[in-house]
Amino acid sequence: MLRRHGRSVSLITNLFALLILALATSSCIHFDVTQAQVPIETVMQAIHEYGRGHQVLPSPAASTATTETEESYRTDVSLLLAEENFAELEKIAERNRTERPLFVGGLWKNNVFFNALGYPPHEGETKDSDYQFQIRRIQKWVAAYPQSSAARISLARCYTDYADFARGEGTADTVSNGQWRLYNSRAATAKESLLAAARLKERDPHWYEAMQQVAFREGWDNAHARELLDQAAGFEPSYYHYYREYADYLKPQWYGKPGAIPAFAEEASSSLAEPDGSILYFRIVSSLACNCAPEVAELPSVSLTKFRTGYENVRRLYGFSNLNANRYAFVAYTFKDKPSAQQAFASIADMEHDVWWGPHTFEAARAWANTP
C-alpha cells in the first residue's frame, strides 16, 4: 500500500537493517512441500467448532478508536517481529482480542496487526528471500509460544501472501504449472496452520478472515464460502472485514456473477437496525471503489442514498478517515453526484492508491467535482 505516513526514517531504516542482517546470517530455506489435501468436511467441522461457546459482545464503542495511524501501527508491529520481540507481539494480540480497539474511521486494529505480519517488509520489489525471512521469524515465534494462536494465524497469513507471490499478477493462462504447484502448496500450508491454531485454547476473530483468504485461493464453492462467512459473523458480528473478504470472493472476475455484490450488500445490511445496517452497506459497497472495470460495472445497481447514509454514520460514530473519504468520493464521482463528490474531496488530504488509478484520475475527478 503506497501511502505517506509520519514514521521516522530511522525507525524504518532500523527495520531493514535487521532484515538484511538476518538474511545475511541464515541459510536459504525451502518451504515448498507436497501435502495431502485436507477434506473440506474436516475444515468445515473446525470452522463450526471454532466459535462454540464463544460469547458474542456488543459492537466496540467509538471511544475505542485511537488517533494512532494505521501506518505507524503497521510499522511498529513489523519492527517487533524483526526484533523477535515475541512477548510484546503476544501482549498486543491479547489486547486486540480483549479490548477490540479501532482506528479512527472504524478499522479494527486486529485486522491491521495480522496484515502487517503477513506481508514482509522490503526495499524495492518483493523477493522470495523476503518471504523466507518473514516465515522463518514467525516459525521462531511459534516455537517460543506453542500455545499462541496469533503466531499460527500470522504464519497462515504469510503463506497466503507467499502463494500470491508464486502465482504472480498475470492472467491464469500465463501462470506456469510450477507456479500453480507453489501457489496450491502454500495455500495448503496456510490452511494447516489455521487448523493447528483451531486446536489451541485462544480464539481470535481474525482466524476466520485468514480462513476466508484460504477459501479464496483454493476456490471453495459458494455454499462453503458463505457457510464460512456465516460462522465468522456469528463469532464477531461487528468485524466487518469478513463481509469485505466475501465481497472480494463474489466479484465477477473471481467466483461471483454480475450483481452479486450489490445484492449481498442489501441482504446483509437489511438484517440490521440503523445505524449498523447502513454502515455495513457502506463497508461492503466501498469494496467496489477501486477504479477497476469489473468493480465499477457493479456500482450502478447500488443505492447511493444508503451508501451516503452509511458513510455519514461511520464518520459521525468513528471519526474521519482519509481512506473512507476517498471511497465515498469515488462512488459519488461514478454516480456523477456533484454535491456529494465536492463534499468528499473537500475533506481529503491525500489520494489513496487503493481507490484511484493514479494522480491523473484523482485530479480529474476532483476538478469535475469543483466545477460549477
Question: What are these language model-derived features?
Answer:
Residues 289-343:
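Intrinsically disordered, low-complexity segments enriched in Gly and acidic/Ser/Thr residues
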